Amino acid sequence: EHLSLNQEGQLNMIDLNIRALTHLARHYGAEMKKKGSGRILNVASIAGYQPGPKMAVYCATKAYVLSYTRALHSELKKSGVSVTALCPGFVETGFQEVAGMELGALELSGAVPADRVAKTAVKAMRKGRREVIPGLFNKPIPYANRLVPISLNLAVVKRLMS
């Protein structure tokens, strides 16, 4: 639960996912705009499309990344600079096995290999796309979230994170 998590860790996540990302995108976005070209890739998450019990700050920061990226993409569209949000779901990195984590949720969720996520992200960024969701299983999630009641959405996410 959010209230039992280490507050310093949660604030560090906010600093990284919001403050640092905003600072870097603003700084390098301005430089790219002066040159008349450039690409920015921000790492959001499929979690940015929904609230997440047991990972409230993570989901909230990724929602910020997604919203910020969409807005910046729109602002810079005619300047030759594109901004892309990468919104992966679970990613197979090998970390889970090393950390001794259960893989049940990952296996059921259609986890995507890290190299495929990276290739998909670079391809979308080069094309100037606003956002990209790697993996067939993940693509319908934002649309499904709009169709189901928030209470059901929250229950499903809570169950997946248990």
Residues of each region from the PLM?
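Active-site-adjacent segment of SDR/Rossmann-fold oxidoreductases
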Residues: 31, 50, 71-81
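Active-site loop immediately N-terminal to the catalytic Tyr-X3-Lys motif
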Residues: 52-56
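Active-site helix of classical SDR
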Residues: 25, 61
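Residue(s) in the substrate-gating loop at a strand-loop-helix junction
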Residues: 45
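SDR active-site lid
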Residues: 75-137
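A short helix-coil junction within the Rossmann-fold of NAD(P)-dependent oxidoreductases
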Residues: 27-36
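Active-site Tyr-X3-Lys motif and surrounding loop/helix of classical short-chain dehydrogenase/reductase
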Residues: 1-4, 8-15
